[in-house]
Amino acid sequence: MPRRGLILHTRTHWLLLGLALLCSLVLFMYLLECAPQTDGNASLPGVVGENYGKEYYQALLQEQEEHYQTRATSLKRQIAQLKQELQEMSEKMRSLQERRNVGANGIGYQSNKEQAPSDLLEFLHSQIDKAEVSIGAKLPSEYGVIPFESFTLMKVFQLEMGLTRHPEEKPVRKDKRDELVEVIEAGLEVINNPDEDDEQEDEEGPLGEKLIFNENDFVEGYYRTERDKGTQYELFFKKADLTEYRHVTLFRPFGPLMKVKSEMIDITRSIINIIVPLAERTEAFVQFMQNFRDVCIHQDKKIHLTVVYFGKEGLSKVKSILESVTSESNFHNYTLVSLNEEFNRGRGLNVGARAWDKGEVLMFFCDVDIYFSAEFLNSCRLNAEPGKKVFYPVVFSLYNPAIVYANQEVPPPVEQQLVHKKDSGFWRDFGFGMTCQYRSDFLTIGGFDMEVKGWGGEDVHLYRKYLHGDLIVIRTPVPGLFHLWHEKRCADELTPEQYRMCIQSKAMNEASHSHLGMLVFREEIETHLHKQAYRTNSEAVG
C-alpha cells in the first residue's frame, strides 16, 4: 500500500509539472504572436513598383491588428481553459488520493471494476476513435444506422417527431439552441484560427487581407449522437464570392459515468389519492371501477379514491357502483363530491384536491377512460417528491378497436388490447392531463386556471406553471398507463381554438395512418377484389 501511494504521488507531481510547462509554453507563444515586428528591412506587402495610397496601408494594418487581437483572444481563452483543466486535474488527483485512502481502509468504491482513465484527455480522444467518425462500422441491417439530423442557422430538420414536433422547426428548447450556436462558433474558430495540422490554406481577399468567416457564411450542418460515445457534427461554410467550401468535423465526447447519488426510497406507506372528475358516462365508470378493484383494492391496497361528480343525472348510479364495491371488497377509502354545475375538469380536480383534509398526500389526476397497472402506481410514487419533483407520464392512447380489429367479429377484451404497437395506438405526447404530484405543490402553484372553460387547455396551463417554476418535471412514456378509446364529441360552444384542438385529438384517436388509408381506399380495394374474383371465375369456367 505505501508503494501505491508513492506511485500516485509521483504521477501527481509529474502531471502537475507537465501542465505547468504547457501553460508556460502557451504563454510564450502568446507573447511571440502579439509582439510587434522588429525587422527594419521588412516591407509592407504589395507589388513592387506599384504606388499604393495611405488608406490602403492603414486598412491593411487594421486588418493585421484585428487578426492579432482575434489570435490573442483565442490564446487567452486557451490559457483560461488550461488553468481550468489544471484545477480539474488537481481536484481529480485529490479525489484519487482520497479514494486510495478509502481503499486502504477496505471500502474501495470501484473494487475490481474497470478503473476510470487516469488521463482524461486520452479517454476523450479514445471516444472519438470508437465512434463512427473517420471509419465506417459494419452494421447488421439498415435498422442499425444512426441517421443524422440537419440544421441551418434558423431551422432544424428532424426525423423523430412524435405528434407535437414538426419535420422542420426552429430549435425551441434552450439547450438545443445553445448547443447549435456553440457548435457554429467553434467551427468558425477552427476555420479562422487553424492549427498547423489542419488541411487548409489561408485564403486572401481582394486587398491581400486574410479572409475571416462569420456565421453568415454557415451553409448547413449535420449532427447525430451515439449514446455511449458522443455527438458528431459536420459543418459546411462558404463565402458568397468563393467556389470552395470549408468543412469542419467536431465531436463532443461523452465522459465516463459519474455517480450523482445513491439513495433508498421507501414507498410502503405512500398513499395515493386518485382524483377522477366525472359527468354522466356511468358505463365508462363501471369499467374504470373494475380496473380499480383489480389493481388498487386487491394488489396495491394503499389508495384513496375521490370522485367529483358534476350534475344530477347519473349520480345515483355512481353512488350505487361505489356502494357495490364497498360491500363486495370491504373498501371504504373513497370520497364522492357532488357539484350541481356544468362539467369543468380543472374545477373538479381543484375541488377533489381540497376535499382531502388529512395533510400531505400524493395525488394522481385521472380520467374515467384511463387503465393503469400496479406497476404504474409505484412509478407514480417513485417520480414525485414534495417540493422537488412532479411526474407527467406520457399515456399510450388506444385506437378505435372497431377499426383495429375489423377482421374479427368482436374486438377482444380490454385486457388483450393493452399492447404497444403502431397500429393499436400512439404515445399521446401532446396530452398533460394525467399527472402525479403532491398536494402541497399543487396548492402552492395555484392549482388549475378556472378561466378555462370546456374541453382542453387547463392541463397545459398547469403544466406550464410547473415549467416556469423551480420543481423538476419528469416527463416520460410509461408502459402501465393506457387511454381507452371512446367516441369524442366536440361541442359547438367551444372556442375556435378549443374546437380545433378537439377535432385534432379526435382525428388522431381514430386509427393509425395505415388503417385510415385503408378506409380511404376501401372502394378501390373492393373493386380490385371483385376484378380478381371475376378473373378467377372466368378462368375456372374456361
UniProtKB/Swiss-Prot annotation:
Listed InterPro entries: Chond_GalNAc, CS_glycosyltransferase, Nucleotide-diphossugar_trans
Residues reported to bind a divalent metal cation: D369, H486
Subcellular localization: Golgi apparatus, Golgi stack membrane
EC number: 2.4.1.174
Gene Ontology BP terms: chondroitin sulfate proteoglycan biosynthetic process; dermatan sulfate proteoglycan biosynthetic process; proteoglycan biosynthetic process
Highest taxon of the lineage: Eukaryota
Signal peptide positions (record): none
A GO-annotated cellular component: Golgi cisterna membrane
Tissue expression profile of the protein: Ubiquitous.
Cytoplasmic side, ranges: 1-11
Bilayer-spanning residue ranges: 12-32
PANTHER family, sorted: CHONDROITIN SULFATE N-ACETYLGALACTOSAMINYLTRANSFERASE 2 (PTHR12369:SF20), CHONDROITIN SYNTHASE (PTHR12369)
Role noted for this protein: Transfers 1,4-N-acetylgalactosamine (GalNAc) from UDP-GalNAc to the non-reducing end of glucuronic acid (GlcUA). Required for addition of the first GalNAc to the core tetrasaccharide linker and for elongation of chondroitin chains.
Name of the protein in its database record: Chondroitin sulfate N-acetylgalactosaminyltransferase 2
Organism of this sequence: Homo sapiens
Lineage, opening ranks: Eukaryota, Metazoa, Chordata, Craniata, Vertebrata
Gene: CSGALNACT2
